[in-house]
């Protein structure tokens, strides 16, 4: 006893009885004011970054294609002309890929015009037509010439000045551009030095994007056909998640016992299987000394030492679990009782189950704001125009300086007939552009900090609501009328700074992990094993640190919700309280994890199986109203339903997990504060009192306050 008391003293003294304490303290003050001010100033700066991005950014360069003058196709004056036609796409096809299409607008050294539709038939200017006028030759193809070209201009002049195309190829629109189709059964004049082979080679890289578009259309069609049934599947997931949590008060004990026995049975079968494999390979198998080290991991399946090592590991795990069942059965019973009480708390405050919707909306706002800001920052800059000549050997164009900046609105006073002022891209100069990297870093920091703050807000609000349930002596009579909304207002009013403090600590660790992941990605091709090993060790350490900080923050927010102290004091008190009851913490954590994992498996697996049999048409006789839709890819709505079910189950079970953690801390505080006397009665339910062998004294001449 003396040794245990000394260990407890090392982690602080037990909580003292406070006659005025009746659950979450209402008379509290603002905490971590400096962090609150810092967070608000940072948010103001984040808004300023968004305004700068809005002023200087132009996302149209990603969303819409541009012609040679830099005008956007599909908007403004070109609203009815959504596609770009390249007079000679082969001059830039070799440098085209999907990324450059999106980022650079596919600016190539060839004239580009906005068109209402892409060419459908092949066509070429014949030699005898060069002396005719544009109005006569391009009668049916004026849409493919520069709008400003005069119909009285000679065709030869229009070709030299790059005002009209010399040939047209059957094309298909993709990503807002007209890309030639492959296998064209058409022979072009030899002077153009273009043939079908050249066309096929030049645009082969673009066909992937065209095929991707066809796939995207099919995917859209599948969603249009199956969206209703996907919503039905998500509704089933919601009902299953809610039923699982509400039924835990009835089936928690047998379910936990069944899961533990199931784990023991799986380990026992693993031991048996490893023994069988080891016995077969003991006399005729290859030993580890004979095989040595090899990168072919499948080769180790025929090594007897592999199965022997697996057998030993599984046997140790089996033994540890059996010893835990024998010596920690009392703590397992406490964990089961807390799970039942958590189910009861959720049933009393059903509004808490839908709080994840608030968190989801706030996360969408945070992520959406960052994404829009990052897009506008990436597309900031003034348009740049340079002089360009189609053929510098043309008389009068030999001495023209190309790639020199110009003004597209100024008249071209030059002896070169082919001289153009062409759009090339956006500048990287200017205050916003020079600070682009720093602004993007600021935005990433803002993303992590705001997301972690929103998650912290949800945890603290739920903790306040569930704490008010536990510390209500007569349930449900003493539970506040609106526990969730009261906790929400209380948290925002007093503890924004504390949440920002905890979120900032977690953000810094996550940013460090991102930097390490980036360095590891850069070193992936490196042959230096020492550097790779060091990076791997740092990544492992930061992963463990992040997990620990998340655990500490979660319990700190519970203490903040109950007592209204600042972050550091709350984190210290929570840590000391948990360390004084470390065995109970481990048992409850593992039992809860096992139960929630089974719940997720049940919900996601059930929805997945039902979706598979329905969308694949394996369920017959459902009637006309329940006929499965005709789909191109039936796995698409199945995967969507499974992922949606996982998100819904995670949202519901995260609330339940927070409830268990909150009730557990309140239970530990209850044990330390109270002794069951009339002056200091326990607040825990009768099931926990019975397990612990404790009881509340009955007042003389009256009934026990405890129901």
UniProtKB/Swiss-Prot annotation:
It is a multi-pass membrane protein. The keyword Cell membrane applies. Residues 1-32, 249-250, 329-356, 474-498, 579-594, 657-707 are cytoplasmic. The chain crosses the membrane at residues 33-53, 228-248, 251-271, 308-328, 357-377, 453-473, 499-519, 558-578, 595-615, 636-656. It is found in: Membrane; Apical cell membrane. N-glycosylated; N-glycosylation of Asn-67 and Asn-391 is required for a proper thiamine pyrophosphate uptake. It holds the Pfam family Choline_transpo. GO terms for biological process: acetylcholine biosynthetic process; acetylcholine secretion; choline transport; neuromast hair cell development; otolith formation; positive regulation of cell growth; thiamine pyrophosphate transmembrane transport. Residues 54-227, 272-307, 378-452, 520-557, 616-635 are extracellular. Its main location: membrane. GO terms for cellular component: apical plasma membrane; plasma membrane. Keywords: Antiport, Cell membrane, Glycoprotein, Membrane, Transmembrane, Transmembrane helix, Transport. The keyword Ribonucleoprotein does not apply. Choline transporter that plays a role in the choline-acetylcholine system and is required to the efferent innervation of hair cells in the olivocochlear bundle for the maintenance of physiological function of outer hair cells and the protection of hair cells from acoustic injury. Also described as a thiamine pyrophosphate transporter in colon, may mediate the absorption of microbiota-generated thiamine pyrophosphate and contribute to host thiamine (vitamin B1) homeostasis. PANTHER family: CHOLINE TRANSPORTER-LIKE (SLC FAMILY 44), CHOLINE TRANSPORTER-LIKE PROTEIN 4. Belongs to the CTL (choline transporter-like) family. This is Choline transporter-like protein 4. It comes from Rattus norvegicus. The gene is Slc44a4.
